[in-house]
């Protein structure tokens, strides 16, 4: 059975369905992932649907999944466009984003009038179609998944150059255009208030949370350990800022400096740095002990996490990572796995005592903490239980549902639905013809 909002949460959106039975309409814009592959966006879609909204999504097509141009999944209407990911530096991003904006406006015209346009970054360019829809009566909810200026500094190592100033300007324009801002954690909320100039009452924290029904442990499979006593697991994106290189160097130190070879490691996921990380593993002499799976089905992911003894969160401290909530940390916690992390502000907020923390970017200490947990099964069990309790309690999606619906209620307060009247007029014109 699908868990929906409780009665108090439903009350926050009392006018989601009009007296004439016409639902308010929301249009969610995404550029960097397909839907429902983007789990946060999909949870938002189904929460709004359960609260009576008619939900549309515009997003790119996936390469291996989410490939249909049009789909209706569990009552959510998804409109997808072809998009080639950027290559070749800034010019590649200009081509990608220009194409995405053109397709987004094209499909938004097809969707028609909406009450809320909900734009998810990156990039901080979706305020452009959002402004176009605002002029047609929509309210604009900005869902800030990433701090793009910090992402730029962390990913490209170019300093505060002209492009950095440009992304800062785009962020400011997005904040100004939005009626309501959704932040993924308190650090992002502080940025929206301090740097974005938003009033605190207009910024709502909607934490990402794993789908509990997707992360149900299964019996461990010792064969996944490739004959070793311990399995170490990394799950997530492999981009330049995600720290897979730190994890690999820590594993080399675990072997070379601590003399530990009683482990097998699996890295699940893909990204821009995937090939470089496979090559780094080879150069470090880890090919026999480290396995890269790429993206795998959920069922296989759960098998690895259920068998893992220690999970790795090697995101280095940088301007973005220190204030970002890492989905992999939450997913490890949902599966009851102990975590080794670098000491980042939001990592501690999320994991608490479900993780042990190495000083920022200290690979030797990261390796030592892996060894410590491998040698202490009782501590691993305690940490795993703490993580599961946090995910089912203060970090649960049910709490985020309430905040999301409160944000939509605030966006629509004193704002008459535009879509019902407009659609009625469209129907009358169709009948007259």
Kindly give the residue locations of the regions a language model identified.
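Nucleotide-sugar-dependent
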Residues: 38, 242, 299-304, 313-334, ...
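A short, well-ordered alpha-helix in the C-terminal region of glycosyltransferases
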Residues: 372, 379-394, 406
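Membrane-proximal helix-turn-helix segments that form the acceptor-binding/catalytic region
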Residues: 46, 105-109, 128, 132-136, ...
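Conserved donor-binding/catalytic core segment of Leloir-type glycosyltransferases
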Residues: 27, 182, 224-251, 266
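N-terminal subdomain of nucleotide-sugar transferases
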Residues: 2-77, 208, 423-433
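Conserved acidic donor-binding segment of nucleotide-sugar-dependent glycosyltransferases
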Residues: 355-364, 372-378
């Amino acid at each position: 059975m699908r868990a929906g909002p409780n009665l108090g949460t439903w009350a926050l959106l009392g006018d989601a369905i009009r007296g004439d039975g016409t639902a308010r309409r929301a249009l969610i814009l995404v550029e960097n992932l397909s839907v429902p592959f983007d789990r946060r966006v999909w949870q938002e879609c189904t929460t709004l649907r359960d609260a009576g909204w008619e939900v549309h999504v515009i997003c790119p097509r996936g390469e291996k999944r989410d490939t249909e141009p049009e789909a209706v999944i569990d009552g959510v209407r998804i409109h997808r466009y072809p998009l080639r990911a950027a290559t070749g530096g800034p010019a590649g991003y200009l081509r990608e984003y220009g194409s995405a904006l053109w397709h987004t406006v094209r499909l938004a015209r097809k969707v028609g009038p909406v009450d809320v346009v909900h734009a998810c970054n990156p990039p901080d360019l979706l305020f452009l179609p959002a402004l176009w829809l605002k002029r047609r009566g929509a309210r604009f909810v900005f869902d800030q998944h990433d701090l793009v200026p910090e992402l730029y500094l962390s990913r490209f190592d170019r300093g505060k150059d002209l492009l950095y100033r440009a992304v800062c300007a785009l962020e400011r324009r997005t904040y100004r255009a939005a009626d309501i801002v959704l932040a993924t954690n308190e650090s992002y909320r502080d940025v929206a208030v301090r740097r974005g100039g938003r009033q605190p009452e207009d910024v709502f924290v909607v934490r990402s949370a794993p789908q509990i029904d997707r992360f149900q442990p299964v019996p461990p499979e010792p064969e996944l350990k490739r004959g070793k006593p311990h399995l170490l697991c990394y799950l997530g994106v492999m981009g330049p800022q995600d720290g897979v290189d730190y994890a690999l160097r820590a594993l080399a130190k675990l072997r070379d400096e601590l003399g530990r070879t009683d482990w097998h490691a699996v890295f699940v996921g893909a990204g821009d740095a995937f090939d470089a990380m496979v090559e780094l593993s080879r150069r470090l002499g880890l090919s026999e002990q480290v396995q890269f799976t790429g993206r795998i089905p959920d069922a296989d992911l759960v098998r690895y996490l259920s068998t893992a003894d220690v999970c790795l969160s090697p995101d280095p401290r940088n301007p973005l990572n220190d204030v970002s909530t890492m989905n992999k940390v939450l997913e490890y916690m949902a599966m009851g796995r102990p975590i080794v992390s670098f000491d980042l502000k939001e990592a501690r907020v999320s994991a608490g005592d479900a993780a042990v923390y190495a000083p920022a970017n200290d690979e030797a200490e990261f390796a030592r903490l892996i060894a410590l947990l491998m040698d202490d099964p009782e501590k691993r069990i305690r940490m795993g239980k703490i993580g599961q309790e946090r995910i089912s309690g203060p970090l649960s999606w049910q709490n985020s549902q309430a905040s999301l619906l409160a944000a939509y209620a605030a966006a629509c307060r004193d704002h008459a639905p535009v879509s019902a009247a407009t659609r009625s007029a469209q129907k009358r014109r169709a009948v007259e013809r």
